[in-house]
Amino acid sequence: MSSQPKILLVNGPNLNLLGRREPGHYGHHTLEQIVDDLKQSATQAGIQLDHIQSNAEHLLIEAIHNSDADMVIINPAAFTHTSVALRDALLGVAIPFIEVHLSNVHSREPFRHHSYFSDKAIGVICGLGAQGYQFALQAAIARIHAAEKQG
């Protein structure tokens, strides 16, 4: 583990449009608001939170490859249903991860029901809007603190 525990937050394509893109599915919070709230919560817990959002798959993969995080929180967005490469990046670095989705992907179009990540994630949170990120952060912090006590 790094000297200060670290979480990498990864947000996939189109999440830069949060707050104005289909608010019925994704809510009214902007990505900036979500990330700012998460950083504040992480700092209070003594955790460094690094963030990347990109519409480019290769940039997300490189961020994962280059990370020394203890945990990853990922909203792969549309890559959820298509990206073996992003899945392989997470498996390749062997950093535990939590998958998050703002909307309930299981109540939407059938193509959104399959995830290339869920079977490898330590947990999946979907349908709870921006609050789902906070739940994922709290779970990640708890796992990091438990690992610190053990080792």
UniProtKB/Swiss-Prot annotation:
Tell me, what does this protein do in biology? Catalyzes a trans-dehydration via an enolate intermediate.
Marked site, Transition state stabilizer, at 21
Q: How does it assemble?
A: Homododecamer.
Q: Which residues form the active site?
A: 26 (proton acceptor), 101 (proton donor)
Q: What is this enzyme's EC? A: 4.2.1.10
The annotated pathway is: Metabolic intermediate biosynthesis; chorismate biosynthesis; chorismate from D-erythrose 4-phosphate and phosphoenolpyruvate: step 3/7
Q: Which UniProt keywords apply?
A: Amino-acid biosynthesis, Aromatic amino acid biosynthesis, Lyase
Q: Which GO terms describe its molecular function?
A: 3-dehydroquinate dehydratase activity
**Name of the protein this chain belongs to:** 3-dehydroquinate dehydratase
State the SUPFAM superfamilies in the record.
Type II 3-dehydroquinate dehydratase (SSF52304)
Q: Which family does it belong to?
A: Belongs to the type-II 3-dehydroquinase family.
Encoded by which gene?
aroQ
Q: Does the keyword Amino-acid biosynthesis apply?
A: yes
InterPro entries from the entry? DHquinase_II (IPR001874), DHquinase_II_CS (IPR018509), DHquinase_II_sf (IPR036441)
The record's catalysed reaction(s) read:
3-dehydroquinate = 3-dehydroshikimate + H2O
Q: Which organism is it from?
A: Shewanella halifaxensis (strain HAW-EB4)
